Amino acid sequence: MAGSISGIDWVSRMPVSGVYTAVAGDDSADKAEINTGMANATGAIVQIVQSGVVVGADAKPSLAAGVLTVADGSTYKVTAGDVINWIVF
């Protein structure tokens, strides 16, 4: 039988994921802000689907204090209806 894990808070390091659909307010703010609920997250993976097509262009994702921000780039613009799939860890 395996022993217990002590000294490691492994549950708080489990990835959290979700799907966010951009709204008109995100469009006018030039960014979508997603509260992931994981304040200690240090990394993120983001996939954006716009009009049924995966956007691989220059969206600008950033992560601070559990809030994932996807901002406009030089060619990508956050648009109401964009589907943002995300994982933070």
Could you describe each region identified by the protein language model?
Residues 15-19, 42-44, 64-67:
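Short, hydrophobic/aromatic-rich segments at coil-to-beta transitions
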Residues 1-33, 38, 75-89:
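Extracellular receptor-binding modules and their adjoining Ser/Thr/Gly/Asp/Asn-rich linkers
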Residues 29-31, 65-69:
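A generic structural signal for beta-strand entry/edge sites
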Residues 50-67:
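Extracellular/luminal ectodomains and secreted, surface-exposed scaffolds of diverse proteins
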